[in-house]
């Protein structure tokens, strides 16, 4: 899939960050609170990471008052998990326990597709049937990755209250933001031009042609584009929250 960015992706990240701002406000509604913000989508690694990035940019615009317990550290994201990166539950639990002990809360951004191989392996080892759709894909709604993450970490980090929330329905019903409106306009203008010229293809910025906006050949189009976890902005985000540099997951 050579298309640089799908229409609506930036809006979804914006809206996911807005959703998170309300949900993470619950971090001090109880002692030792674990919040799992689940970003819906089978292969939404980029969206999960971009949502965390936009949320943290929003935090940069806030004013804090540590004297009454209003701190950026407590409002921050403490873990980001995507399908393309290896998941070290034990290592992360050890790190997050220290965060919980220090702040009294832990907030995680989890892609719905993260941890699926581990969940499937655990279900099969227990002799359970893994629910799949007609195409053989694991039914994410049935195995509930967000709840699985919460279950994995809750005891290990001694959480006393757990809150799992999905932002997908909120995000995907939103109107396009200005970035996406501009992107849509540029694509529709070119789409009309190419259609009148009888040139077939999918309109998008072609990453393999220097991000040129063009009609990309149909035979080059495919789904399930993996998120590039080696990008500097993503590695910087993880480093900033104290999470280890990502390693590629075996399934990717």
Sequence positions of predicted segments:
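C-terminal non-catalytic interaction/assembly regions of soluble proteins
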Residues: 115-252
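Conserved small/polar residues in nucleotide/adenosyl-binding loops
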Residues: 2
């Amino acid at each position: 899939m050579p298309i640089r960015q799908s229409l609506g992706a930036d809006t979804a990240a914006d809206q996911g960050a807005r959703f998170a701002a309300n949900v993470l406000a619950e971090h001090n509604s109880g002692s030792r609170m674990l919040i799992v913000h689940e970003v819906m989508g089978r292969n939404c690694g980029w969206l999960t990471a971009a949502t965390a990035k936009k949320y943290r940019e929003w935090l940069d615009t806030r004013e804090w008052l540590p004297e009454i317990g209003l701190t950026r550290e407590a409002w921050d994201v403490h873990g980001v998990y995507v399908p393309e990166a290896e998941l070290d539950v034990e290592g992360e639990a050890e790190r997050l326990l220290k965060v919980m002990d220090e702040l009294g809360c832990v907030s995680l951004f989890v892609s719905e597709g993260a941890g699926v191989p581990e969940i499937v392996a655990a279900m099969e080892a227990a002799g359970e049937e893994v629910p799949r759709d007609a195409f053989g894909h694991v039914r994410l709604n049935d195995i509930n990755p967000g709840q699985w993450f919460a279950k994995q970490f809750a005891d290990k980090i001694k959480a006393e209250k757990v809150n799992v929330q999905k932002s997908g329905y909120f995000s995907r019903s939103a109107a396009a933001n200005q970035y996406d409106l501009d992107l849509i306009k540029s694509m529709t203008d070119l789409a009309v031009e190419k259609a009148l010229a009888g040139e077939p293809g999918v309109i998008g910025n072609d990453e393999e042609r220097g991000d040129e906006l063009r009609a990309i050949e149909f035979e080059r189009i495919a789904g399930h584009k993996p998120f590039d976890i080696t990008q500097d902005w993503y590695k910087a985000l993880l480093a900033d929250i104290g999470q280890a540099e990502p390693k590629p997951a075996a399934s990717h």
